[in-house]
Amino acid sequence: MFYAGNRLPYMMQLGSGTFDALPGITFVTQHENLTYSAQVQGIIRLNSTTIGYQLGDEINATTWLGYTWWKGFGSSLRLEGNWLETLRGNDPSMYSYNEIATNPQNYGGIRLQGLAGLSYQFEEGFIANHRIALEYGIPLYQKANGIQNKLNQTWMASWSYSF
């Protein structure tokens, strides 16, 4: 149980408490109506917190294939993988093993997700260059460290503007 003055569990805190390197690389190519992209990004924790723990490093990779069918209407298939290391150390002010959320062994894991999407790019009028998109995903593989909720499905809706 949490009371006033207690620190929140690790993932509910507003930051990592460390300096982090954020490397990444993106590749995009287009041939007529077909677009292919791949991206890898990471979070590398460069130090520990003054409290005595360090969030795990992260690697996120995604690749997708998109096709524009006609006049701005397109669809896409995407594969996304996430790897998150477990926490190193612990915060001694938390009762680490009494609560699932404060146990440092219950963080991190591997997830692979498959996603499919639809989009429409407006080409004329006052909403030209606006894009709406909807994407649905399901987990293909999940291996969580410790006790964690698993992902069942994801939905993403967006509205963006290009200039």
Language model segments and positions:
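Outer membrane beta-barrel transmembrane domains
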Residues: 55-163
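Outer-membrane pore/translocation modules
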Residues: 1-48, 106-107
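Outer-membrane beta-barrel proteins
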Residues: 49-55
